[in-house]
Amino acid sequence: MARSDLPDTAVARRHQHARLFHDRGRMRIGLLGGSFNPAHEGHLHVTHLARRALGLDQVWWMVSPQNPLKTSRDMAPLDMRLMQARQMTAGIPWIRVFAPEAGFRTNLTHATVRVLRQRCPRHRFCWLMGADNLQGFGRWQHHDIIAQTVPIAVLDRPGYSYKSINAGRRLLKGRKSAARFRMMALG
């Protein structure tokens, strides 16, 4: 059964998550979380850049049921956003699209990252974040725990670079370079 034709039931989600979390050995995985409302070429572009720069084995697009910092008024239904993201990534085997927060019953990144690390202890995760999101990172619940738990790769976006990096300098203090992340993930 293809990823995009799974029935929308809790049982199917658990089965899908179980397959996704099956430990295939140590992998370097980039986590790109967001609303994906809608998924677009920019998501693909930063995914490809991050994979090359960080030497990632996979990138997981984690479609959030509801970003706690955004209004739900203009949000497309989760199933539609998942379908669009899967269509956009069809044929790219190293990108996985799923909604872990729906299965974990949370919409908070720190809790999602904690569960992923528990379920996949051999994998090495890196949070992928657009520079525009770095400006508001301090408003994320338990942002300090996220920054201590996983490396964060900040990806430049048009109009967001130096200003965002400056705003997040304290949060990124002591963070590793892409080359250092590769070495850490291999070790």
Question: PLM ranges: what are they?
Answer:
Residues 2-187:
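Nucleotidyltransferase catalytic core that binds NTPs
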